[in-house]
Amino acid sequence: MVTSTKSVARKASAIVRRKFFFPVAAAVALAALAAPSASAARTTGTGSESAAACAGGTLLTAVSAQRLPAGATAYKYDLPNGTSFENIAPPSGFNYVTASSALLSELNMPRRPAGAAAMKTWEAQVAPFARSGISGSEKFCEMAHAAPEPEAATAGQGAVSAAPQAAGGHSGSTGFAGYELQSGPYHRATGHFTQPRTDSLNRSMSTWIGLNSYAGSAGRLIQAGAGNEIGGGGGSPFWEQYCSGGSASGCNAAVGDESAFARPGDTVSINVVYNGLTAYFQVAINGTLVINARDPMRSGSKTGGVADFMTERTAGDMIPTSTNITFSALRTYAAYNSNTSVPFGSQKYFGIEMTTDGHFYNPPCSNSHILMFPANVTSTGFVNNYCRSF
């Protein structure tokens, strides 16, 4: 549920996302850790394609590798805040159809259901994450600043009567466009989006899927997606645990996988989950799993009150010129161990429109204040419609 606590936290927060999607130089692999297959490298891009530096951030390399009981391999990375996360790779020859329940759990995949119809839905969800591009040679970059969170009507953004594209209401924002599902609580949000084609000027943005909560200072926004970098049409996949309640304790800035790259037109698949005090982040590009991170949450942390599907303008930058961004196969799960999901279109959704001044204006793009707005809702997705840069 959206409350005034949410807006207060947002107004009080001075934290902004800087230009955190920077290409990072390909680095030396850990000697004892396996490299991804050639096919995976071709699918996701190579380090040279995003080669430069982890500018303004901290370059992270794997410090250890551990074989888990069911056969997956966990590569450990230490974060500057003193915590660590693991990026988990499937075993060689992994087949999600025949894998044990224990292995599916290690890999952050939902339980295999019974019944033909349920199996068809389940296979469509897990198939994009079944081919591994993960290895100990992957380099991550934690940027120096965390992200803001999307604003809702309670933040005083000039919401009026319900817009045609938002069954649960709407607001304007200077930084976000997309929908927020408000039929939670949720433990899992999944879906795909098409990586947009953007210009090469000094502008950047990102598209992501996440879970959020507004329960005071314990609130957490857990999100994963892909950026559109300055100077390039695509960008690096990333994950982040952001303290949406206002306290920065135990949270991190965006952590980008600089060994992978999402090109314009690529299908980016996201699976964001939490269970107890553990957050899970999966990102796949064209069916190759590149991020399968497991990150601890501080005691008392709360998330899953809403599910967010957003395009975000990098603070301080003009929004790049862009193609429209199609979100598809969007589903949520009410329980971590459940194999029952609910499609996007059957839930209450709240629309957020990106504008020049943060106020809401009725679409379409003929209104010069509108930068990007969500519409074209189907049972399983929608489109973020680009209008103009600003």
Label every PLM stretch briefly.
Residues 2-41:
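Secretory targeting and sorting signals
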Residues 41-390:
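Exposed, interaction-prone regions of secreted/extracellular proteins
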